[in-house]
Amino acid sequence: HTDSSFKKIPAKYSLLSARNISKVGGNTEFADMRNAYDSLEIKTKDKIDKMICEHSLIYSRQRLGFDMVKELSSDEIKNFTPVEQPLVRKNKATNRKTIFLSSHIGKIKNWIRPDSMCFIDDLIEYSTQLKFKYIHEWSINDLIIWDNRQTMHRARAYDDLKENRDMRRTTVLGEEKLI
């Protein structure tokens, strides 16, 4: 996922530090969305360059099996109204394009939801290939800083019933709306 993509002004950077780690598992994977974009076929770049996606925390929780209608009040649901974000962003400093993917995407604008999700899932699968990834194996006191504008990340499984893991995260707000 990408941190806070469901907010009107998405996160710029995130920092994660390890206070206590699991003995097995619990790695964090980062995918470079710049290189993923660069390696796409031209026809795919042309297709996605102007796409707009709806992001919401509700979408990502539903994908995990949560029934958000039962678990949230109507006021809480209003707080997670989908936010439109471009599927492709351009870094103003480098002029380099990047795919702005996240598990918080629930729909591509003007597409039906099933087609949207199939397309997004295929794009995520492509963009998270090993050739685009850095896998961090945690040590105590590690601090990782990443740019949410050009990466996706995910934590890998560990035995949270048997192991105590203490990770501290800070998220830096972005500077502007993307749309």
Region annotations inferred by a language model:
Residues 1-143, 148-179:
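Non-heme Fe(II) oxygenase catalytic core, chiefly the N-lobe of the double-stranded beta-helix
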